[in-house]
Every structure is written in C-alpha cells, then in structure tokens.
C-alpha cells in the first residue's frame, strides 16, 4: 500500500529565514496529519539551516503518524535517531554543506558501515531505508545490508521512456463563436 510522508524542511527554511517561530513547524506538521498524510519526514543537517534537532524531538512528542528522519549518519545524527526512535530512519550520504541530497549510497563500497548502522537501528525497532542510486546491484546491496526500504535518487535514473514527441499543446484561446444562421433573403 502506498503511503504519503510529507517532508517539512522547507517550512523550517521559511521559519529560519524570518527568525522567530513563524511558520511553526510543529503546527504545520499537525495540520498535514489532519489533512491525511501518513507521516512526516524531516532531514536535520548539522548546520541547522532548516529542521533542527530540537524540532525533531518536539515533533516526536506530538505526531500521531509516522516520523521519518533522513540524514547522513554522523555520530550526532545516529545519537538523535536512537534517542527519538522514529518509525523510520533514511540513511543519506550527503555532505554537511550539500544544498540537497544529490547522490545515493554505494551499498557495495559501504556495506559494512550500512550493515552495522542497520543492526543498531533494528535493535530499537526502527525501520531502515537507504538512499541510493538505481543500479540493480546497489538495490541488492541495500537488501544485503538489512534495509527494509530504499529511497531512490531519481536524478541518477535513466529515462524510463523515449522523450516526449507529441506536438506541444495548443495555446488556450477561446473557441470561435458558432456560425450565425443565414439571413433571410430580401423580398
């Protein structure tokens, strides 16, 4: 069954750019739950430029749906995940200064690290997802590490179909008026 988990990082970006607590990420997450989302996803980064570690702790206290914490498994991140015990952790190999996640794990090269982390999270009943590029051997590597799920980096995906070759859509213009009935012949 497909489930929707909404990433609220951009809400935190707006809050942080304004200073203060508007918009309130906690209230936004609660509203998203009321609107029907199955979970909330956050990606705290070491520089705290959007979701902060305290946001994660506060979200865990109030959410009624799943919490998914994404991030690079640096020691402070691993400690946060073990403390908060979300439903899911998504391991992402992004650099601390990355604007966004732009490459997945090489699950073959990092197998020992990922297997060890997965085991630690499983001990706390935390589901593990691994962010990876789509080659089949990396997908198999994620399974071999014990991951329950995979988060695929779609930037690295090859096109799934040939380029779009249909003609471009016509501009939206009003339809011409219907033809007028002929005028009666003069007498």
Feature annotation, model-predicted:
Residues 1-70, 74-76, 80-86, 144, ...:
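Conserved N-terminal beta1-alpha1 strand-loop-helix module at the mouth
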């Amino acid at each position: 069954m497909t489930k929707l988990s909404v990433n609220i990082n951009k809400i935190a970006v707006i809050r942080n750019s304004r200073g203060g607590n508007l918009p309130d990420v906690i209230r936004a997450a609660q509203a998203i739950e009321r609107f029907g989302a199955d979970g909330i996803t956050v990606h705290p980064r070491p520089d705290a430029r959007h979701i902060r570690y305290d946001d994660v702790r506060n979200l865990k206290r109030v959410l009624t749906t799943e919490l998914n914490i994404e991030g690079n498994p640096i020691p402070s991140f691993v400690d946060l995940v073990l403390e908060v015990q979300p439903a899911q952790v998504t391991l992402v190999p992004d650099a601390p200064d990355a604007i966004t996640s732009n490459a997945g794990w090489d699950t073959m090269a990092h197998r020992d690290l990922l297997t060890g982390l997965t085991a630690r999270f499983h001990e706390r009943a935390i589901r593990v997802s691994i962010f990876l590029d789509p080659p089949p051997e990396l997908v198999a590597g994620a399974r071999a590490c014990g991951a329950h799920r995979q988060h695929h980096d779609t930037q690295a995906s090859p096109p799934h179909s040939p380029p779009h070759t249909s003609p471009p859509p016509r501009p939206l213009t009003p339809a011409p008026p219907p033809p007028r009935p002929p005028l009666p012949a003069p007498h």
